[in-house]
Design a protein with these regions (language model features):
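Conserved N-terminal catalytic core of the sugar/cofactor nucleotidyltransferase
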Residues: 1-26
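Conserved core of the sugar-phosphate nucleotidyltransferase
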Residues: 6-11, 27, 39-137
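Short aromatic/hydrophobic "clamp" motif used to bind/position activated sugar donors
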Residues: 31
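Catalytic metal- and UDP-sugar-binding loop of GT-A-like glycosyltransferases, i.e.
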Residues: 34
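Hydrophobic helical membrane-anchoring modules
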Residues: 134-136, 140-173
């Protein structure tokens, strides 16, 4: 059984790809993973991601992300006694006080669109590999908590007509 609380994306994708092979079903060159926890997407952005990975032949996968407003280099842990503990070994309490512009931008994986290569997965028994492309997307809302769901519902009400127009256009094609 692969559907457990600690199951990974690799677990279910690898299971699926092996099942396709076992059943003698030709698998596609690419698998596109659209996570249900990121429900609001622009199809044009997904098309750009597909074109991007097709152009980058040496890539092993593509993972979407948006630039974080803050860098993880400024984050810290709290010790059992309530004191600062660094997340990154080079960061002292003084270093995390530097302006965020002094740090390289970091990307937050967001589930907008991830693309995998089934042949690579079967051969290497890895999902992403060392040549994972970063595909920058607009910032998006992931539904991880009730608060996020409330934000999505508010946006849905605000943009209901745009969504209906888009869906009607698809129906006609």
């Amino acid at each position: 059984n692969i559907s457990k609380k600690d199951s990974t994306d690799f677990d279910f994708i690898f299971h699926f790809v092996r099942w396709l092979k076992k059943e003698g079903i030709d698998f596609p060159k690419y698998l596109i993973h659209l996570r249900p926890t990121t429900p609001i997407r622009n199809p044009k952005v997904i098309k750009k991601a597909i074109k991007f990975i097709i152009r980058k032949k040496k890539s092993t996968s593509l993972r979407s992300g948006h630039i974080s407003a803050e860098t993880f280099m400024k984050w810290f842990y709290k010790s059992d006694k309530g004191y600062f503990e660094r997340v990154h070994k080079s960061m002292t309490a003084e270093n995390i006080d530097k302006p965020r512009q002094k740090f390289r931008p970091v990307y937050i994986p967001n589930g907008y669109v991830d693309i995998y290569k089934p042949e690579f997965i079967l051969k290497k028994k890895k999902l992403l590999g060392s040549q994972m492309l970063v595909f920058e997307t607009p910032r998006c809302i992931e539904v991880d908590e009730i608060y996020d769901l409330n934000v999505i519902n508010s946006l849905k009400e605000k943009n209901k007509q745009k969504l209906l127009n888009f869906l009607n256009k698809i129906k006609r094609k």
